[in-house]
Amino acid sequence: MARLFGTDGVRGVANADLTAELALALASAAVEEVADRGTPPPGPVDGVPVARSAHGIDHRPLVVVGRDTRPSGEFLEAAVVAGLARAGADVTRIGVVPTPAVSYVVAATGADLGVMLSASHNPMPDNGIKLFAAGGLKLPDDVEDAIERRMAGPAARRPVAAAVGRVRDDSMLVDGYVDHLLATLPGGPGGLRGLRVVVDCAQGAASDLAPRVLRAAGADVIALHADGDGLRINDRSGATHLDSLRDAVVAHGADAGIAHDGDADRCLAVDSAGEIVDGDQILALCALALAERGELERGTVVVTVMSNLGFHHAMRDAGIDVVTTPVGDRYVLEAMRSGAYSLGGEQSGHVVFLRHAGTGDGLLTALQILGRMAETSQPLHELAKAMTRLPQVLVNVRGVDRARAETSDELRAAVADAEAELAGAGRVLLRPSGTEPLVRVMVEAPTDELARDVAGRLADVVQRALR
């Protein structure tokens, strides 16, 4: 049986793969596993006080639940809440919020578990369930595996009478998240006065909060795709479709553009000329800023195997060490925690500032980018020169057996030939997706033409060898 949890929770087409029955069963199993473990939380995110003990023999588990704007989120939330309450957990619903808001509220309230209903950047028919442990960190793999075993085992004895969980709504808890974000801004609240910013909310979870936070920080804000229309979430908008943001930044004469995905755990940017500033460039400029302030713990940044070689060269030249992990912000976070590092992230725009958040936070990242612009009086295109990108081509090969990607002799030989052709001046990476049925072919080379040529040939081999 395939593992239920992927690299970022459970995902699938809502009401087909991800059903109400599955959501209910998963929620109950998660509460039972967390309650039985009774493990103390790793502590709150720095600066986030724990307001409630999460432990004790007679303790009733507390769970925080949020969702994005997808229509399917409504019935899935109902199923999740039912599963939590029938297992004896008290539930606090905080409404439509970014994923990192759930992480923050879990830490701030001392909750035992957090549940976010979102499929992030995936299209509208999909949805997902992300789980956060006490302290606001994502559940480790071994806990997810234990939850799956519970789901496959005999039903647990259910509480009755006064022992069943209670449910309440408290969207006001999100105000604390907003205050927390503003407190991280270099220069303090109001520090973005004089900056005009276009923010693309992808019709997702940030549709209300992103413009609100930026305005509270003093920016002149033009909100794009911010109606909260879940039927159009991520539809030609947000962090995976930057064309409309690029056009809007130029049309409005804005200093910068900010793009979030459906659950706002990622952030990409656009400079005043409409040029894209990706996650690697954001990490580079933030690393230099933190190093300058003496806040880059152990002089190290954590990235994934997808980060551009140009990033590694820039950090080397700046005297900053780089730790590399598999793809997935959970693995970045694990490396950051184990090494006591303060900054890490992915090229896709997941950036983790561990002094302020327990997960990637798009709104927090936007404030750090814009705050650096205000702090230095430099335009974004100048700050983005913190690194020079090597041409990189990414090809998604669909309709193949991704499970065989690491065992195919034909594919292994093709990769070896490509690496020999690049002769150390570039690199090749083949990676089965952890969230979608495809294999990604990534090639970096001294020229765009060579990168495209090598990537195209490798993609053909993947299609032939793995079909």
Curated annotation (Swiss-Prot):
UniProt family annotation: Belongs to the phosphohexose mutase family.
Protein task: Catalyzes the conversion of glucosamine-6-phosphate to glucosamine-1-phosphate.
GO molecular function: magnesium ion binding; phosphoglucosamine mutase activity; phosphomannomutase activity
InterPro entries attached to this UniProt entry: A-D-PHexomutase_a/b/a-I (IPR005844), A-D-PHexomutase_a/b/a-I/II/III (IPR016055), A-D-PHexomutase_a/b/a-II (IPR005845), A-D-PHexomutase_a/b/a-III (IPR005846), A-D-PHexomutase_C (IPR005843), A-D-PHexomutase_C_sf (IPR036900), A-D-PHexomutase_CS (IPR016066), Alpha-D-phosphohexomutase_SF (IPR005841)
Identification of the protein by name: Phosphoglucosamine mutase
Catalytic activity from the UniProt record: alpha-D-glucosamine 1-phosphate = D-glucosamine 6-phosphate
HAMAP family the record matches: GlmM_B
PTM description: Activated by phosphorylation.
Keywords for this protein: Isomerase, Magnesium, Metal-binding, Phosphoprotein
Residues recorded with modification Phosphoserine: S120
Organism: Parafrankia sp. (strain EAN1pec)
GO biological process annotation, one example: UDP-N-acetylglucosamine biosynthetic process
Matching Pfam families: PGM_PMM_I (PF02878), PGM_PMM_II (PF02879), PGM_PMM_III (PF02880), PGM_PMM_IV (PF00408)
Highest taxon above the source species: Bacteria
A GO term from the CC aspect: cytosol
Annotated EC: 5.4.2.10
Catalytic machinery residues: S120 (phosphoserine intermediate)
Cofactor note: Binds 1 Mg(2+) ion per subunit.
UniProt keyword Protease, yes or no: no
Residues reported in the UniProt entry to bind Mg(2+): S120, D261, D263, D265
Needed co-factor(s): Mg(2+)
